[in-house]
Amino acid sequence: MVDHARARKMADRIKEIVARKLDRGIKDPRLGFVTVTDVRVTGDLQHASIFYTVYGTDEERADTAAALKSATGMLRSEVGKNITARLTPSLEFILDGVPENAAAIDALLEEARRRDADVQAQAKAGVYAGDEDPYVKPRVIGEDEDDDDEEGDEDGDDVDRSAPGYEPAH
């Protein structure tokens, strides 16, 4: 049976242990500015995926990935000493793509703002294609605009009986 609360607690504990060990315990010069962003533990508590970001170039990211891979055994033993579980989960380090995705989204939002500003500038300089007020005004009863109702049909239905195709209803 999967206990999600226990898996979440273990993930939080692993995140804290690994971050502390990376900050103070590993002396590998290849490790750059590493930040542990998230840890996910499987429901059976056998595997932990550790997401991290690295501040720096692609080469520094690759060096940091190699340093983390070489330190995985030591980090796993440190996790095993500090958690209360029968088995120590295996650790997998995954480079987190959130910062790059966030930068791409920020660039897209900036482009959208620029385009919106361009559209607003064009709208201010634009003129109406037709009348300025395209809406039909309601007729006021009592105006003498249409006098042909008085001389129209006897039955008052305003049907043009001389129109082509007109057939009277039977």
Swiss-Prot record:
Gene Ontology terms for molecular function: ribosomal small subunit binding
Family classification: Belongs to the RbfA family.
Alphabetical list of Pfam families matching this protein: RBFA
InterPro entries: KH_dom-like_a/b (IPR015946), RbfA (IPR000238), RbfA_dom_sf (IPR023799)
Acidic residues: compositionally biased ranges: 143-158
Assembly with partners or alone: Monomer. Binds 30S ribosomal subunits, but not 50S ribosomal subunits or 70S ribosomes.
Protein's name according to its UniProt entry: Ribosome-binding factor A
Classification via HAMAP family: RbfA
Entry keywords, A to Z: Cytoplasm, Ribosome biogenesis
Gene Ontology CC entries for this record: cytosol
Compartments (UniProt record): Cytoplasm
Region (Disordered): 123-170
Main localization of the protein described in the UniProt heading: cytoplasm
Superkingdom of origin organism: Bacteria
Organism the protein comes from: Clavibacter sepedonicus
Keyword Protein biosynthesis attributed: no
BP GO annotations: maturation of SSU-rRNA
Functional note: One of several proteins that assist in the late maturation steps of the functional core of the 30S ribosomal subunit. Associates with free 30S ribosomal subunits (but not with 30S subunits that are part of 70S ribosomes or polysomes). Required for efficient processing of 16S rRNA. May interact with the 5'-terminal helix region of 16S rRNA.
